[in-house]
Amino acid sequence: MEEFQGYLELEKSRQRDFLYPLIFREYIYAFSHDHFLNGSILLENSGYDKKSSLLMVKHLITRMYHQNHFFFFTNYYNKNPFWGYNNNLYSQMLSEGFAVIVEIPLSLRLVSSLEEEEIAKSYNLRSSHSIFPFLEDKFPHLNYVSDVLIPYPLHLEILVQILRSWVKDASSFHLLRFFFHEYCNLNSLSTSKKLISFFSKRNRRLVLLLYNSYVCEYESIFLFLRNQSSHIRLTSYKGLFERIYFYGKIEHLVKVFANYFSAILRVFKDPLIHYVRYQAKSILVSKDTPLLINKWKYYLVNLWQCHFYVWSQPERIYINQLSKRSLDFLGYISSVRLNPSVVWTQMLENSFLIDNATQKLDTLVPIITLLASLAKAKFCNVLGHPISKPTWIDSSDFDIIDRFLRISRNLSHYYRGSSKKKNLYRIQYILRLSCVKTLARKHKSTVRALFKRLNSELLEEFFTEQEQVLSLIFPRTSFTLRRVYRGKIWYLDIICMNDLANHE
């Protein structure tokens, strides 16, 4: 009954946009604990378990009720042997609670916006592969591209001010600001970049919240001016744009830009500018002349410097021709190349050949980057020669083969959209031979002897599994299956790429 009453209080707080009381509710920390337990640094504490977790939450709430000014920023718990060597335990718990609480108004606005627009929850749009069909459709008809790395604010107060437009509750806002500043002072973190790096190992949800709020603020202004309207027509962003005083801020900003950058505003009417972003990297693509995209470059620099107080050098944003330079984006090396074709035409008694060259987007596997990742994970040396994985020899043969198979399957799944599969086959060969060497080292046998015994099984596991899956979708004809297996396939279930060494 008490838990049910707590959820009722949570609903009331949501309706009133008053989040401050939630910081004193135990179920908030229970939500965050369940989410972060598997990947939390709390697991490094030998004295930490579920029972002590509940005791620590109660202790944290009690101390906050007594207004001891965030005792977790002091050396109080350093003297208590119960906490072991994890000196940031309380601040870790509170940061996880903050992340859950601040997400509440954001998620509610997104859900309400989706309901108003009657948008179906399509999880396929979350896949990184969903971007490539758009690139294949647009890039062959465009000429110039500029890849832009979004700079990050140097001062923490900028991030706090951005969050202010999301959080109505002034108490929660000031509490969050105090937490950030005290945390930076305690750990000698002078910039927000250091804070993000520090938190990325402890609370990734809070890191993503800070970064996404900044990027959303930047893109909201960017797209607002791009569309030249008070109403954003892009439904995918609508849920993120309805914020307090948003349109008032934008109208004021438009007046400023109209007075000082009137020439730039005329650029927005051009419909041939395309914008794509993934994480911190964005791409601007245009047609005809580089003048248009060059104006956009200076517009972005002025936007960052005037609105976010972020220094960015225009000289470091390069504009290149798509036909002459490859683009490193989303783990692929993409470029536009001519695809020549010859058509035999016959008119009456005359027959002749017609050369027809079309532009096509090539997506290649970045072999150098993947070899460096494999070498870092100790699957091969820096030259790409397979080596054994000594840290795995204590596992069973089945677990060793299963680990290598999962990594090979993940890489094959992600890079099935490659135009050429030769580099992908090379990576799979390295993993297969590294697996054999690991087993040989475990059994103190030679690679040749072990490879003869396991060769057929490994070949079947590593190289025929993809064909077995495709055979369930397409007719079992060798010609059709061979064409499908060599062609491009973009999967819409890929949210992120797992780390090679920690793939589970």
Swiss-Prot record:
Keywords from the named record: Chloroplast, mRNA processing, Plastid, RNA-binding, tRNA processing
Signal peptide: none
One of the record's GO cellular component terms: chloroplast
Outcome of substituting V102A: In cv. Borszczagowski
GO process terms (BP): mRNA processing; RNA splicing; tRNA processing
Highest rank taxon of the organism: Eukaryota
Keyword tRNA processing: yes
Classification via PANTHER family: MATURASE K (PTHR34811:SF1)
Family assignment from sequence similarity: Belongs to the intron maturase 2 family. MatK subfamily.
Biological role stated in the UniProt entry: Usually encoded in the trnK tRNA gene intron. Probably assists in splicing its own and other chloroplast group II introns.
Name the record gives this protein: Maturase K
Phylogenetic classification of the source organism: Eukaryota, Viridiplantae, Streptophyta, Embryophyta, Tracheophyta
Gene of this entry: matK
